[in-house]
């Protein structure tokens, strides 16, 4: 019985890895459809960290785990692999943390 379950688990995992679509049945959004979306990058490595929301011309709201010593915030991105003319990059001057209790 354990061998059968192990084989079923391996079969299921190997099938799941073959899927090439990230979102099943999804469509690519239009350019500037989500213009309040911000992408946060680590300045030193250039790695994508997480997303945020532009809630004011000078404020981006993110989750607490997005904190790094030096961040780059990119706005106006449609595809992170393609650079567009209206993309903007900013560096935060201050960071604020609010604890929910």
Swiss-Prot record:
Gene Ontology, cellular component aspect? extracellular region
Q: Which Gene3D superfamilies match?
A: Trypsin-like serine proteases
> What Enzyme Commission number(s) does the record list for this chain?
3.4.21.-
Pfam families xrefs: Trypsin
Q: Which cysteines are joined by disulfide bonds?
A: 50-66
> How is expression of this protein distributed across tissues?
Expressed by the venom gland.
Q: PTM per UniProt? A: Glycosylated.
Stretch forming the signal peptide: 1-16
Subcellular location field = Secreted
Regulation of activity: Strongly inactivated by diisopropylfluorophosphate (DFP) and phenylmethanesulfonyl fluoride (PMSF), and to a lesser extent by tosyl-L-lysine chloromethyl ketone (TLCK).
Locate the active site.
65
* Propeptide span(s): 17-22
Record-level GO BP terms: proteolysis
User: Where does the Peptidase S1 domain lie?
Assistant: 23-101
Q: What superkingdom heads the lineage? A: Eukaryota
Q: Which UniProt keywords apply?
A: Blood coagulation cascade activating toxin, Disulfide bond, Glycoprotein, Hemostasis impairing toxin, Hydrolase, Protease, Secreted, Serine protease, Signal, Toxin
The GO molecular function terms of this record are: serine-type peptidase activity; toxin activity
InterPro entries hit by this protein: Peptidase_S1_PA (IPR009003), Peptidase_S1_PA_chymotrypsin (IPR043504), Serine_Proteases_S1 (IPR050127), Trypsin_dom (IPR001254), TRYPSIN_HIS (IPR018114)
- Is Oxidoreductase set as a keyword in this record? no
Coiled coil regions in record: none
Indicate whether Phosphoprotein appears among the record's keywords. no
What is the annotated role of this protein in its UniProt record? Thrombin-like snake venom serine protease that releases specifically fibrinopeptide B from fibrinogen (FGB) to form fibrin clots. Shows a preferential cleavage at Arg-|-Gly bonds in fibrinogen beta chains. Cleaves fibrinogen beta chains preferentially to alpha chains.
Q: Subunit structure, briefly?
A: Monomer.
The UniProt family comment states: Belongs to the peptidase S1 family. Snake venom subfamily.
- In Swiss-Prot or TrEMBL terms, this protein is called Thrombin-like enzyme okinaxobin-1
* Protein species of origin: Ovophis okinavensis
């Amino acid at each position: 019985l354990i061998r059968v379950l192990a084989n079923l688990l391996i079969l299921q995992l190997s099938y799941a890895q073959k899927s090439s679509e990230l979102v099943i049945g999804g469509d690519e959004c239009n350019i500037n459809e989500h213009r309040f979306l911000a992408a946060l990058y680590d300045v030193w490595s250039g790695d994508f960290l997480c997303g945020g929301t532009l809630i004011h011309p000078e404020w981006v709201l993110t989750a607490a785990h997005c904190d790094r010593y030096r961040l780059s915030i990119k706005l106006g991105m449609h595809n992170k692999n393609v650079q567009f003319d209206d993309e903007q990059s900013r560096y935060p001057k201050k960071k604020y943390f609010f604890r929910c209790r």
